[in-house]
């Protein structure tokens, strides 16, 4: 409750009535004065009752308006517009998890794809669109609530041992993507009353959203590179992972994944680094000379799995191997 300002003294106290000296008066005048006072009281009483009547009317109107709003809300709720409650489940997966994730409009982490034959696929529990609500910590048995996308992906990639995941089952509904869903479009059209202009508005919203996401990806990439340059690899990973979760172009995905691999290499996280490097190669990264000479990847190059990984994608190496095989077949390599 707020206090009334001091400029309104009537809200604080009533002014005292003026004092008059008692004088001898004509009885008739006294009676008349008394009559006027009684009349004034009568009028005050009537006006009070009138005020109460108006207040009662206003209350009735307010109640009717409230009932109308309630009925309107009930009708609106009949279309299934109420916030939906989702089932949760908990499951443990082994590496390779066989899951791809994306960043939702709310900054959360959602399943974007389930790779056939992976640990997640074998459980039969996951569906595309399910939301991550908690995961195992990097070490031990502690459970960490899912933070924003970059931090959650950092935890998942760094996890040593089986990964326990607490999920929110969305039943295949991917409603938190960057664009308006079909359900949202239909709802918007119904509320707008005229479809054509609303559709144009939705298309414009989607265009602006894509433009905004692209600008954000570029910003995250620049900040990630700066963090990496300053040796702040964990902060850099959050930015690069955010790029990867925001529907990047193949070129953006390849560059971001390559930098993720470099960061994990500097943090001596070999398996996570090799996984990110594989994603970079699958996204079209082809600077194999740089991969074999970049000092940031030195730790990964020491791994026995490094060369076999590159040989899967390096066509120049494949062609060289094919030529050597042919030479051996026809005896050209014999001295």
Swiss-Prot record:
Residues 1-18 have a biased composition (Low complexity). Residues 97-136 form the PDZ domain. Residues 1-29, 66-88 are annotated as: Disordered. Expressed in leaves (at protein level). Mostly expressed in leaves, stems and siliques, and, to a lower extent, in flowers and senescent leaves, but not present in roots (at protein level). Phosphorylated rapidly (e.g. within 5 minutes) but transiently at threonine and serine residues after wounding. Induction: Repressed by wounding at the transcript level, but not at the protein level. Strong level decrease during senescence. Low levels observed in etiolated leaves and accumulates rapidly during light-induced greening. Transmembrane segments: none annotated. Involved in photosystem II supercomplex formation and repair, probably acting as a psbB/psbC chaperone on the stromal side of the membrane. This is Protein MET1, chloroplastic. It comes from Arabidopsis thaliana (Mouse-ear cress).
């Amino acid at each position: 409750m707020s206090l009334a300002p001091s400029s309104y003294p009537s809200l604080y106290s009533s002014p005292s009535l003026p004092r008059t000296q008692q004088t001898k008066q004509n009885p008739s005048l006294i009676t008349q004065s008394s009559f006027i006072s009684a009349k004034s009281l009568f009028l005050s009483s009537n006006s009070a009752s009138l005020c109460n009547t108006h207040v009662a009317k206003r209350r009735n109107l307010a109640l009717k308006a409230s009932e109308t709003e309630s009925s309107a809300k009930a009708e609106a709720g009949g279309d299934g517009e109420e916030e939906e409650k989702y089932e949760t489940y908990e499951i443990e997966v082994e590496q390779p998890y066989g899951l791809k994730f994306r960043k939702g409009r709310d900054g959360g982490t959602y399943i974007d794809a389930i790779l056939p034959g992976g640990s997640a696929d074998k459980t039969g529990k996951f569906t595309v669109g399910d939301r991550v609500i908690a995961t195992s910590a990097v070490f031990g048995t502690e459970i960490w609530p899912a933070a924003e996308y970059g931090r959650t992906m950092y935890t998942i990639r760094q996890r040593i041992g089986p990964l326990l995941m607490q999920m929110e089952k969305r039943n295949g509904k991917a409603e938190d993507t960057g664009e308006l869903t079909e359900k949202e479009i239909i709802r918007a059209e119904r509320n707008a009353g005229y479809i054509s202009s609303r559709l144009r508005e939705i298309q414009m919203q989607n265009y602006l959203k894509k433009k905004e996401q692209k600008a954000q990806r570029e910003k995250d990439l620049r900040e990630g590179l700066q963090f990496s340059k300053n040796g702040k690899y964990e902060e850099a990973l959050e930015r690069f992972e955010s790029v990867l979760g925001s529907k990047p172009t193949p070129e953006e995905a390849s560059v971001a994944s390559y930098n993720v691999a470099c960061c994990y290499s500097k943090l001596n996280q070999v398996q996570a680094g090799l996984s990110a490097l594989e994603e970079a190669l699958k996204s079209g990264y082809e600077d194999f000379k740089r991969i074999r000479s970049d000092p940031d990847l030195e730790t990964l190059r020491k791994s026995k799995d490094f060369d076999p990984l590159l040989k899967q994608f390096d066509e120049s190496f494949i062609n060289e191997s094919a030529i050597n095989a042919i030479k051996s077949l026809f005896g050209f390599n014999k001295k």
